[in-house]
Structure formats: C-alpha cells, structure tokens
Amino acid sequence: MEKRDYYEVLGLTKSATKDEIKKAYRKLSKQYHPDLNKEPGADEKFKEIAEAYEVLSDDQKKARYDQFGHEDPNAGFGGGFGGGGFGGFEDIFSSFFGGGGRRQDPNAPRKGDDLQYRMNIKFEEAIFGKETEIEIPKDETCETCHGSGAKPGTQPETCSTCNGAGQINQAVDTPFGRMMNRRSCTTCHGTGKIIKEKCSTCRGEGKVQKRKKIKVSIPAGVDDGQQIRVSGQGEPGINGGPAGDLYIMFRVQGHNDFERDGDDIYFELKLTFPQAALGDEIEVPTVHGKVKLRIPAGTQSGAQFRLKDKGVKNVHGYGMGNQYVTVKVMTPEKLTEKQKQLLREFAEISGDIPEEQGSSLFDKIKKKFQGE
C-alpha cells in the first residue's frame, strides 16, 4: 500500500511550524495510543503518526522529505545512492570527469551497520529515568571462524576473476565513445575473496544471529520521540572494522491525570462552586508527590496556577520544568430541595433570578401577575 503524505498524516500543510508539528503529534498520538485506544487499526495509525513525526520534527530529515518525498535516496540507516540500476552510469560519469580514484577496497575494514530499536516506556520512567535491560536480535561475529567465514585452519582465497578488487572493468559503448564501466564481481559478489571450505557454524557468512541482552540507561527527562545512542551495539564490523551503533527511540505512554509539554506538566483541577467562590486549600497531585495549593476566593473556571519546579528535569541538565494547574469549576447535576432553595436565595440577593427549567406554565403565569 502506498505511503500517505506525512503532512497529511498529521493533518498539516507544508508551511506548518515546528510548534504546530509538535502539537499535532501530541494530540494524535494521545488519541491513537494503543494503551488508550482499543479500536481496530489504532496501533497501525499510531505507528504511522510516530513515523511522520520522526521525520518532520528533524530539520535535516524534513528538508530531504520536502525535496524527495518518500523516495529520499538517503532515507534510513546506511542509506544512499549506489544500488543496482544507477551504478553503471555513476561509474561512466565518474570516469569521464576524472573521479575514478574513489574506488573502495572491498577488503578494507568497514564499520558495521547501525541498528534502531523503539522502546515503550511509562510516563514516570521518562520523567525520573531508569536502569533497564532490553533483548534484541542482532548479528554477532562468528566465534568459530572469527568472522572470516572460512573453516578453522583454512583461509579465504583471493578471487582470481577480480584479483581481490571485488570489481571488474567492462567496456561500455556510450554517446561519448567506448568507456570502461566498473561492476561488482559476480564470482565473489564484490568481496574479493572466495571461501572454498565454509565455516560450519555460520555457513560462510562470518556472522551469526543471536538474541543479545543490552543494559540501557533511560535518561531522566527524556521525551517522546527522542533517542539515545549506545555505542558499539549495532551490527558487527566488516573485515575487522568497528561495530555499528544502536539507536534507541523512546515512545512514552500517556497518563490518566497528567499531560506533558516539554519540561512542563499540566493538570486539570476540578472544583465545586463553593470552593471556587469562597476559596480553599487543596492537596494537588504532582509527579513528585502531593502539594498544598491555596485557591483564592472568586477563582474562575480556566484560571491557572503554577507550581514551580514541580515539572520534569530537563534531559540536557537545564533546570526543572513547572506544573500548571488549570481550574475547572463543576456545576452540580443533582440538587436537593434545600440546596435549590439556598441557590434561589443567593440568586435573589445577587439580583439575578434564573428562569428555572421544570417550572409549570401555571407557575410562570402566577409569577408574571405577581410581578416577580
């Protein structure tokens, strides 16, 4: 199935600002988070939203996406030009303009590929950090042959077709005349080596797949979509090169009571009419424990109070965020007759007598004649 446009996924246009992208992601990820939304397809929708945000929130990835769309030749780890169909023309123009010196030695040590792992963590784990362990499938250098791919006691031989270069030259007729085109050697598949007696453990691959446990330190203050690098825990290096790195991207679960925006926490405090009108002192929950908050008399619905340093520790060490408490005054749905009478008396004193629902036509006519 064809991928949807990332801007369309987040309900945005290409002119959207970073702040708009972030807000759209937070809204949609909360709406479709698998822990909060059990509808069929919510999980796939959440993954689509996360993928769109991962690209559009990164300036470099966004710039490439805006230019190439989903056909970005540099997308993903280890990506880049140089696949099947364009290799010939690249070599032709490289030779024509004098770029022939860029050929790589297939036997030179090369760094292994990077790996990416998405890790789901709880709201509190993201705020306070945690030491944990993950288990991932990854390739490891074969311990039997030490990565050579050859049976112990033997060595790979130099390919006689390409003399160990891993590439062969081929004459190609072009509009510029006959030119030499380099192609991967089909005998050794570009490795420059021939393994006559393969290692029985890895079957000549030089590596085996294992499930490896890796210790991970979740940094305090990490936010949804951020990632950390675990050096040397990617795929094994080639020809004795260093291993790649493991990038762990965090997906933070939502919370029933709190909402996070950067280093700040938001909490909705429900008050009764008497509490808002007369004032009160209330215990308010925070991620750090309960604190007392004084509600001044006459507080209106929508009023906001700041609890300094009761938010999230900045992941880069730039201080603490705050918690913002937003008031919501609740209107009682069921009243006793005594409560209704007291409210009527209050309304009379205030000079604002409401036309109550449920009054009979006779009562309304009676009040009219009585001048009420």
Curated annotation (Swiss-Prot):
Family matches, as SMART domains: DnaJ
Any one of the GO CC terms: cytoplasm
Major localization listed first in the record, in broad terms: cytoplasm
GO MF terms, alphabetically ordered: ATP binding; heat shock protein binding; unfolded protein binding; zinc ion binding
Record HAMAP family: DnaJ (MF_01152)
General function of this protein: Participates actively in the response to hyperosmotic and heat shock by preventing the aggregation of stress-denatured proteins and by disaggregating proteins, also in an autonomous, DnaK-independent fashion. Unfolded proteins bind initially to DnaJ; upon interaction with the DnaJ-bound protein, DnaK hydrolyzes its bound ATP, resulting in the formation of a stable complex. GrpE releases ADP from DnaK; ATP binding to DnaK triggers the release of the substrate protein, thus completing the reaction cycle.
Protein name, per record: Chaperone protein DnaJ
